[in-house]
């Protein structure tokens, strides 16, 4: 029987700063390593990161850092953790490329050789558990959920996600994989719950693209679009709408 601990170091009752520690016997699995940008009352502070004390004290037990996607709330604090611990970092191709840029900006070039690109078909076996992945829908490509499988059952960490059957292939959820995970037995579900209290269903990506295209076609003059820079899905929709309506983007 495995001794299992699940310790949230960030991301609980707050949006951002995601970091879960899953400890199975003597092995520590770090799930995400994000930061959060401060509210207005924290003037002069650029970002808030998790307290790494527990991980630093047990740094020799860390078998890997696993990233769900390439947004700051999931990987923005990674360079600060790597200044204190040395562990393999796993993520999809885009996530690792963004993590590499972030690490280089902090002068952590020596850690990059310990960055590994994975996809949802990869399964990594450790002494105390097996780590696997499943594809999720988010606003950035290459988003994954993480499964830590133990002899007591699986610990499933979703990362940021939504369900949208109209999403394109590179953003689509692997529902078949989710079914397999559920049938195998889940010990604990660590789920994104942002806006879970909102009963209104979010608009599908397909409708957003159609609405943008309609606006572009019907307006005679210039159209100015504002978007969060990290919402790559929305930026791609903007390009699709411009192409379909014969507009040029400046």
Locate the predicted segments by residue:
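His/Asp/Glu-rich metal-coordinating catalytic cores
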Residues: 1-66, 71-250
């Amino acid at each position: 029987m495995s001794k299992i601990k699940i310790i949230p170091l960030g991301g609980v009752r707050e949006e951002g700063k995601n970091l879960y520690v899953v400890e199975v016997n003597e092995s520590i699995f770090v799930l995400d390593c994000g930061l959060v940008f401060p509210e207005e009352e924290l003037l002069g502070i650029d970002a808030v990161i998790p307290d790494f004390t527990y991980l630093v004290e047990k740094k020799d037990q860390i078998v890997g850092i696993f990233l769900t996607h390439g947004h700051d709330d999931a990987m923005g604090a990674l360079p600060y953790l790597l200044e204190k611990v040395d562990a393999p970092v796993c993520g999809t191709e885009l996530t690792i490329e963004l993590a590499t840029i972030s690490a280089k900006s902090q002068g952590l070039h020596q850690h990059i050789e310990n960055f590994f690109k994975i996809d949802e078909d990869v399964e990594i076996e450790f002494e105390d558990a097996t780590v696997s992945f499943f594809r999720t829908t988010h606003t950035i490509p290459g988003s994954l959920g993480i499964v830590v499988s133990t002899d007591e059952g699986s610990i499933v960490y979703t990362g940021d996600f939504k369900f949208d059957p109209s999403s394109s292939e590179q953003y689509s959820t692997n529902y078949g994989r989710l079914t397999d995970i559920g049938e195998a037995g889940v010990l604990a579900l660590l789920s994104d719950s942002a806006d879970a209290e909102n009963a209104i269903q979010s608009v599908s990506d397909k409708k957003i693209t159609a609405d943008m295209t309609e606006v572009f076609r019907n307006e005679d003059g210039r159209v100015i679009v504002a978007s969060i820079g990290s919402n790559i899905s929305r930026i791609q929709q903007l390009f699709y709408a411009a192409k379909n309506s014969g507009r040029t983007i400046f």
